[in-house]
């Protein structure tokens, strides 16, 4: 197992994360207003970008967990730890942002039901909540139940498979998009799409640096000796 990052490397990495986060903030604030929503469109766009980033992190987590199940080496498992530590909490943040964005931007005029009841009918919000429950279960198993790394990695892989099935079903079936417009960002002009893709790139880079830092500090301390049963 490699040594933990030096103080200078940590400071440089944290500085890079701060710079990337600031870049994301500036990009979000400079998004143009749109007819109807005005400046309220900024939160949904950032939520969409952050969700894209989290889906990519889940994909990397699943791939890394699968590689570890084959190789059973410390270095790969350190990346499993780092990606898990970043991707799982980010989904919780994204779930909260998604709910706030829905309540702030959807038009409930003329509905006889409360906004909460209407929002609950959106398959995308429902999927977010189901996967949020899955995140909680994965973290609880990781912290309180599983002791062997192989069991932790198998749980990660099972969660990623569940997320892939649920999200693919929603994205591929137009009938399940419910209240959510069909690709509102991708159907916009480049004054929206350009900043959106820049936000995705910067936010993804920020999360990867965070995963790398966790890998460096937490990974070496999590069962550094490969158990004989895992060989």
List PLM regions with ranges.
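Polytopic transmembrane helical bundles with strong interfacial aromatic enrichment
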Residues: 1-231
